[in-house]
Amino acid sequence: SFLRAFVDYWFDLANEKADWNGKCVLVQPIAPGLAKMINEQEGLYTLYLRGSENGQKVDDKRVISSVSRCLNPYEKADYEKMMDVAASDDLEIIVSNTTEAGIVYDPACQQNDCPPSSFPAKLTQVLYHRYKAGKKGIIMLACELIDNNGKELLKCVNQYIDQWGLEDGFKKYVNEDCTFCGSLVDRIVPGRIRDPKEVAELEEKHGYADPLLDVGEVFGVWVIEGDTKLNDILPFRKAGLEDHVFVTPDMSPYKKRKVRILNGAHTGFVLGAYLAGFDIVRDCMHDETILGYMNKMLLQEVVPILPLDQDDCKKFAAAVEDRFNNPFVNHELMSISLNSTSKWRARNMPSFLEYIEKNGKLPTCLTMSFAAYIAFYSNNIQELNDKGLVCKRAKGNEYTISDDRYVLEFYNAHKDDDIPTLVHAVMTNEQMWGQDLTKVAGFEEATVKNLTLIREQGAMAAYKSCL
């Protein structure tokens, strides 16, 4: 949903406004996907951008025509077609958005896998095929929400080049002829409209049904880090989109502000809010306790430790409430919960640790957010199946957690632990956090206390205790 509501949208505008005449070929990162449906519609789909812009309500509908087709590389014929695209003279740009867990080096991936499981391994295969075909280098735009996403992706590709024993000429091609750019994406994309009544009303209004209908907020910014000469290659400045899509030599100020404030707010409150019975982000903004908890976390624990202009950060934080309160978008908390382990590590843990370094004490709300994360992943576990870890919340319904398999297996294995044992096991799992979090003074004791409060009195009482 995100790539279609963001990347393909900007290229669609470039086609219209700059006569770019480009097409996007989508490639599924995993076997289940929308390839068949997208191809049945010849790449066409309806996008609604909804929200507020300059104080005015916006509800724009656009049929996106920048997608030519979608390939599922887990099917042999499509894998071969992917390699045909790799060797095409027309290929100029590759864009990735495989979540925080996507840019990883997995040594189990082999050169002859069709396809390998990790995205960097797939990309290495694609670039090697292109190199052997004698084609020019490409521009790689990584959109994953990790620090130095472009550099980290290039690092993974180089690891596969070494592991697979590929020639030095190819390594030079990747590192010199190809351009790996980091980028920052900022648009909330809930995906499809889930209210059957609203879907029926739109179908009646526009005269057609679109099972690929996508929804995003009207706000959108894409910051690409690289040589500003890329502005002459990419179509966006020519299309007059430079306020929304632009190249800068250093995107770190934009990145840190967005990930720590906007994304950090999401991961910081949604897991506890879901356990408290909420399902939609907007509804959380109408609850004084959750809103107060989020604003305290942002304004007292996150913004003050950012080495950026404080007024700009406060304005950005203030806009978060408006964006989350979008009347058009039913952004489900469960959709945000995807890969929350790596999300908390990337979005919240840096603010948490830097706050402690600056203030010499634990940040109240960020500390609570970690306990809420553990509570969400361990709440009345029912089973572990192929779809994920099935838990049950107090409201009565089951929910399925999607995360790396090792994370789900970990929580399933510890489902009968008492609270202190579980907290200690989670905090000492360095595969999850990159360090032993029990070494943070007072953090383990505080998390045991907070998780106990959530389990005994509920997440809402826990959030209220932070205010």
Predicted regions and their residues:
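Substrate/ligand-engaging "lid" and interaction regions
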Residues: 1-467
